[in-house]
Amino acid sequence: RVLGKASHAAGAPEKGVNALSAASLGLQALGLNRETFRDEDCVRVHPIITKGGNLVNVIPDEVVVETLVRGKTIEAFTDAAKKTDRSFKAGAIAMGAKVEISTLPGYLPTLAEEALPELKHAAEISASGIPVIEASGHAGGSTDVGDVQHLMPVYTFNTGGVKGGLHQIDFEVTDEEEA
């Protein structure tokens, strides 16, 4: 949350501290930090502004930015989270605003590990002729299965019967029984 000082945008803008400008600088700094993320760490940072002010003729005194940070390892997303926080602190400092950062836990990264032979065999039997595809390594998304994988072995699977990308406009169920 970025906090500034409201003032009339036309009559006395110099008396305000624009929280939206501070947040915008934070977003720009975060964007410039992206080149510091190593490709092999699969870091993804997704910020959105959920509150950008109250009225168009008032210098915004509060802006709320929510951000999801993901990575292939705990170290990778911890590093990205620090850079994210630092970016928004810098934006606030530059504009004379204040920033309140609340860090909430997200999902732990998933672990792409070889399946235990007995689990793999059981999956092949239950698949009844449907080909079993080997794990292909880390995927860009995250899910609570990563949390469980850090505690115990987990055998994950996907089904067919769909085309297109998950959470994308082209996603479509093509075979309801298989899906």
Where are the model-predicted features located?
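Midchain, well-structured core segments that form catalytic/ion-binding scaffolds
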Residues: R1-I125, G137-G146
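Ser/Thr- (and often Asn-) enriched beta-sheet segments in non-cytosolic proteins
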Residues: K98-E100, P131, D170
